[in-house]
Structures are given as structure tokens and as C-alpha cells.
Amino acid sequence: MKKVYVLAAALAVALLVVSLSTSIIAALTPTPTFDEVRMSTLGSESTLLARDGEPLQRLRVDMTRRQLEWTALHAISPSLVRAVVAAEDHRFWWHFGFDPASGASAVMDQFGNGRGRGASTITMQLAGLITEGDRFGRRSVDEKLAQFRYAIALEHRWSKQQIIEAYLNLVPLRGELVGIRAASLGMFGHAPDALDEAEGAV
């Protein structure tokens, strides 16, 4: 019984240390708000309007990528959200921006066979996407630490729903397609809310 109390106390102390550490990191790491990111995300197309405000024509203004208007989370198929979380970061809804279990597994793989798996969570990937097109990417240790700090700060200031919504709108998916709306229309011919289980898995 004494061992149980000792383990419980140790766990409580560890959780307190983690909570304080992440709070300090978040306080020292500035990030934009969700609305700032959403409003500053520009699509690759521009709409030509008539004098009365009616749309006349859509023009492609960026030929390097195809990114359409921002899509709210409620307008994205839950099947797709589940598929992305399962494939990219299955503990997304529970971690604080960094997944210690995946990180430890990646380190073990690296030392075991030299082919380490990526340990970046969805929040860490979003941190890279927000900071000038994934400039953190697969870079130096210092840049990875910066990505780690940024992800923790995002988790403190944004909701999980905001994080997954921003990720799905900013992530490059296939070829020139950026964001879920461009990918859904380009690959399947319909909006993100109509994706079924099979399409979501793709």
C-alpha cells in the first residue's frame, strides 16, 4: 500500500512539474491567435466581382499552389478528421502539443536501426506550417526545440478543435493541393463535408 502512495505522490509531482513547465514555455513563446491565422490565410484564387457585388469569374493568382477558401471544422467530414488523427497523431486529443510516447519510440527506432520515425504531433506540424511554410521542418535540433515550444504555446492558447481546423486548412496534401477544400474538390469532386470513410482514409 505504501508503494501505491509513493507512486501516486511521484505522479502528482511529475504532473505538477509538466504543468508549470508548459505554462512557462507558453508564456515566453508568442503566437498568433486562431482568428489572425484564419484571416491571413490567402487562397490561390481571386474572385472578380460585378458592380453589384455578384461574382463574375474566379482567377488563379498563384500558380505554385492550389489553395481555396478556409473551411470551418463543422463543414469537414468527421470521417476525415478521424482518419487524419489516426494516421498522423492518434493521441492528438490527449497530449499537450508533444507526445512523449511517440518521441521515445522515435528515439528508440533511431538508435535501433538508424531509421527514426517522425515524432511530430499535429500541433508541432501546425507550428511549422504557421511559421512561414514549415521553415522548422526537418532542420537542426535548435529549430526542432523552437517547434516544440511553439506547439506547447499553441496548445495553451487554442482549443484542440481550432488546432485541427487550422491544420486541415494549411497542410499540403498532394502535389500542388494545399488544404482540405482544394484536395477534396481536386481529388474527389465534392466539398469536404461530403467525404466518406474510404475517401477520408486516402
At which residue positions do the language-model features occur?
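Juxtamembrane regions of bacterial inner-membrane/periplasmic proteins
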Residues: M1-V202
